[in-house]
Design a protein with these regions (language model features):
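Acidic, low-complexity, intrinsically disordered peripheral segments
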Residues: 2-60, 233, 245-263, 410-448
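Amphipathic alpha-helical coiled-coil segments and their boundaries
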Residues: 20, 27, 57-67, 71, ...
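A subset of solvent-exposed loop/turn segments in beta-rich extracellular surface proteins, enriched
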Residues: 30-58, 99-156, 192-193, 197-198, ...
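Gram-negative and organellar
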Residues: 43-74, 83, 105, 205-208, ...
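A glycine-/polar-enriched beta->alpha junction
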Residues: 61-68, 72-96, 101-145, 158-162, ...
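Charged, solvent-exposed structural "stalk/scaffold" segments
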Residues: 142, 146-149, 153-228, 367-438
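Acidic, serine/threonine- and glycine-rich low-complexity intrinsically disordered segments
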Residues: 200-204, 208-325, 339
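Intrinsically disordered, low-complexity segments enriched in Gly and acidic/Ser/Thr residues
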Residues: 271-281, 297-410
Length: 448
């Protein structure tokens, strides 16, 4: 039941096309419709609703912010735990062994001195200090390795988490503009309905060619199609005329290029990758492949004569590889850094080329918007001037021509709103290309 009511409400709000073909038209009715529409348009144009251009809402929403903060805190906690593990790695290690010699139990023919030199079992414990594999050797680099790996994962995750904000911003901006564009088209459609009615009446009286009527009918069909696409689920009937304040967008290109080179997520990811390669290069050294372990050992022996003897000793245990692969590893890491830089330079070059195209488009749209704003201003003045002329025209005047004047003004407004929408979408495309989350410092909109 609730679903049926909801569908009924949507149906009431949705746009439905108007009559295309009229019958039994009368001259007085057609003229009355013209006069009513002229009066309505004069009232609407003299009392418009002034609105600012829709704002590009690109900032992260509350859910995005909460998710990113939670993920960041988890990465930072992970880094802290892993670095604490590195700091607790002091290199101390205890080893021990216990073993017996069964042959010592059966060999009883030897003299006491010889039996004293043999033993039935042995217990040995050793405390060693593995210096190289501890926090005391390159501890800073080992902690950096953990931190950089987590920072890279965090940035890559943040880039994935924020990937959809640009599509959402474009959809929101388009929806806002579509409402204003749709209301203008709806007013233009009201004009076309009356003109279509007049042309059909004139065609019935053989006072006009079929071409003019077909042209108006086609314009009417196109307008209805546009409304059905732009505002299919919104009620735009009987709306005021929304006058959007024309504006110009200024771009701080220096800040934009700086953002691409240094501040964007992609730039920070590349920076972290280079830092990882630098840090790995420091960790790749010959000493790091060796093993040097000072130790203290205590041994207890159960001799063949059933006596216990103890002894302790200290020493250094070491292992030195007879090969050294680290110079090649460092060269490989330097090559990897060059690959990262080369790939980044190529990406930046392509991004800047795309951005330059979009910047040129924004500049052209700024000029086109200024031109349309001038046309709207001049047409409005012309309509005001002609309104008094029509009132004083005692011999009558061409109603169709006057309706064309109003329709021309509406068409110019429609064009300007579409140009402003396209400019906003171009800005979003730039922000998407260079990973901008806040455009306040780079893009500035000023009223003309």
């Amino acid at each position: 039941m609730a679903q049926a009511q909801r569908q009924q409400q949507l149906k009431k709000k949705s746009f439905s096309p108007k009559m295309l073909v009229y019958e039994n038209l009368k001259n007085n009715n057609v003229l009355r419709h013209f006069k009513q529409r002229f009066a309505q348009l004069d009232t609407l144009l003299n009392n418009p609703i002034w609105v600012k251009s829709p704002v590009i809402d690109l900032g992260l929403n509350k859910q995005h912010t909460a998710d990113i903060k939670k993920t960041d805190s988890l990465y930072w906690a992970k880094t802290a735990h892993e670095q604490l593990a590195v700091n607790r790695h002091n290199g101390l290690e205890v080893t021990g062994q216990v073993y017996a010699r069964p042959d010592a139990y059966f060999d009883s023919e030897n003299d006491d001195a010889e039996q004293a030199s043999k033993y039935k079992a042995k217990i040995q414990a050793e405390l060693g200090w593995n210096i190289i594999n501890s926090k005391f050797y390159q501890g800073k680099e080992k902690r950096n390795k953990v931190a950089l790996a987590n920072e890279l994962s965090r940035l890559q995750g943040k880039k994935r988490q924020t990937a959809d904000i640009y599509e959402k911003a474009a959809d929101d901006l388009t929806e806002q503009y579509n409402f204003y564009i749709g209301t203008v088209i709806a007013h233009r459609l009201d004009n076309l309905d009356i003109m279509n009615e007049a042309y059909q009446y004139m065609l019935e009286k053989d006072r006009i060619s079929n071409d003019k009527m077909l042209k108006v009918m086609n314009e009417k069909l196109e307008a209805e199609y546009d409304i059905s696409i732009l505002c299919s689920d919104r009620d735009i009937s009987n709306k005021p005329i929304y006058r959007m304040k024309p504006s110009k967008v200024l771009v701080d290109t220096a800040a934009l290029w700086r953002h691409i080179d240094e501040e964007s997520i992609d730039a920070r990811i590349v920076m972290v990758k280079e830092q990882i390669a630098d840090n790995d290069s420091k960790l790749s050294n010959y000493l790091g492949t060796t093993r040097i372990t000072p130790f203290a050992r205590w041994s207890s022996y159960w001799q063949s004569n059933n006596k216990i003897s103890n002894n302790g000793d200290v020493g250094v245990r070491f292992t030195f590889p007879i090969y050294n692969e680290n110079p090649r590893k460092r060269k490989a890491l330097e090559t990897e850094k060059e690959i990262i830089r080369s790939s980044r330079n190529t990406d930046v070059k392509e991004i800047k080329q795309s951005v330059n195209i979009l910047l040129k488009r924004i500049e052209n749209l700024n000029q086109a918007i200024a031109t349309e704003a001038y046309h709207i201003n001049q047409t409005s003045k012309y309509i005001d001037m002609r309104r008094f002329a029509y009132k004083n025209q005692k011999q009558g005047y061409n109603y169709l021509m006057r309706m064309d004047e109003y329709t021309g003004l509406l068409e110019s407004m429609e064009r300007m709103y579409k140009l402003m929408l396209n400019r906003g979408l171009a800005i979003i495309n730039i922000e998407k290309a260079v990973s901008i989350y806040d455009n306040n410092n780079i893009f500035k909109e000023i009223e003309l």
